[in-house]
Amino acid sequence: GYEAYIVGGCVRDELMGRTPGDYDITTSALPEQVEQCFAGERTIPTGIKHGTVTVVLDGMPLEITTYRADGEYTDHRRPDSVSFSTKLGDDLCRRDFTINAMAFSPRRGLVDMYEGRQDIARRTVRCVGEPDRRFDEDALRMLRAVRFAAVLDFDIDRDTLNALINRTGDISYVARERVFAELNKAVLAHHPQKAFRAGKRLVLAALEMPDGLPNYDDAIETMPLLPDDAALRWAALLSGAGADGAKAALTELRAPNSIIGRTCAAIANRTRNVKPEREKVLEALSELGEECLTDALTLAAAQATHAGDAARAAA
């Protein structure tokens, strides 16, 4: 007798013809009622205080969360309290972006109170309600806007972008590890340049480079010319800072040491001139190792390709 809907990113992905990474369910049932409904299955009280129970069905974990309304956000990251609700609308109105604020059930069909489906058609990331309020509640949402725009190749709505730019300083409320996680997903997107161009001020603030990053505009155009490799993409983005600057930025973001090492080595050796002679190649391999040499040459080739494209466009 309880309502239940799949909700959020999985609905967005289904509408876009993408394969969802996971499925989230929202329900009118309280956590203990969810556990009763699935008494014969494995349940995990993942975040029962905030209404979430994970149910494992056929080996697949499903997060089931009670409809809820958020209290005040005094730390600019998480609500101080949540209250359970019996209304789906209370749950949808607290979500970050319209494309993530849709719900679906076989009985009722699609519930789209904020024109999320239209924003998918418009290829737009837009906040639910007042953007300034959404970002004031949770500063991580600013980076999520850039990430979704990059991953989905969407534009950021004008009012949403203006609020994001005006609240750039609030990125300091977000843990460095979370900043890296969001930026890393954006860096690995197939078409990241448009989002990184629109969100430039926020990205530089997140990297703690408010005075700028040399060759930023060229760097973001170079990223999609590289394989889907985090170290190489970061090397393209941060090459203007040099190896030392890249190391400082990535260390501050608590990036994995493996990424920091490869990124900095690629930047440091990208200008190395290795002549196409067996002896010279073997010498470089002996000095740098296969991975480092390959990374450096791959980065240099992508940067040269972009430089050539830019020169032809300007001619």
Go through each PLM region and give its residues.
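Catalytic cores of the polymerase beta-like nucleotidyltransferase superfamily
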Residues: 1-315
